[in-house]
Amino acid sequence: METTFRNADEAFKYYYNLLHAEGIDFSDTRALFNVGFTLRKPKETWITSSFRQWNEKYAEAEWEWYLSGSPCTSTLGEIYGKVPQIWRRMENENGEVNSNYGHQWERGYQLDKVVAMLKDYPNTRQATISIYDGKEMNKYRNDTPCTYAVQFTILNNKLNMCVTMRSNDLWYGFCNDQYCFSQLMQMVSERTGYELGEYFHFAHNLHLYNDKLGMDNMLQRKADYYA
C-alpha cells in the first residue's frame, strides 16, 4: 500500500480508488482501517479531481472560523454566508459545536504552549494539541470530534506534523481537514521560524459514504452521453 504522496490531491485519488477496490462494508460506508500516509508538500492543498468539485472557498471559511475560536455555527455563517446543514445537525441547543478545532486548541492556550515549547526545546516530544477529550464524552452526543490530536516535531531542522484521527470521511472530512491542518502547520512554522517539513496523517477508520461511491464513473458516463 502506497504511504507517501506529493500532496493531498494524490492521496485523495489513491484512497478513493482503494476504498472502491478493497474497502470493507461498514455501516453505511466503505472503510479501511489504520491508514497512515505522508504528504511531502503540505502547502499544496488543492483537490483537483473534477468529480469531487472541491470548494476551496468553503475550506477557507472553515479555517477563518477556526481562527475566530468561536464554537458558534453562526460565526461560520457570517464568514461563509450560510451554515452548511451538517453543522446544523451537530450543534447543541446554544448553536455551538465541539468540532471547531480552533476553539479546542485555544482552550488552555494549547497552541501558544506548543509554539513556546518548539522554540525553547526543539527536541521536545510534548508539542501536542489535544482535540478529543474523554472527560467530555457526555457532551459528544451530537458532535464527537473526529480528530484525537495534532503533534509537531522538529526533524532535520524542519517542522513536521502528525494528525491522528479516530474517523475520517475521505470525501468531505479529509479534503477540508487537510486544508485546515496544513494552514495550522504553516502558522506554527511562521511562529517558530522552522521550515515546513512533512505532514503525516493517520485515520483509524478512513471511509467513503455509500452515496459517494462511483462518483468518478458517473462523471465519465455523463461525458460519454454528451460526447
Identify what each model region corresponds to.
Residues 1-227:
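Terminal, non-catalytic protein-protein interaction segments that mediate quaternary/complex assembly
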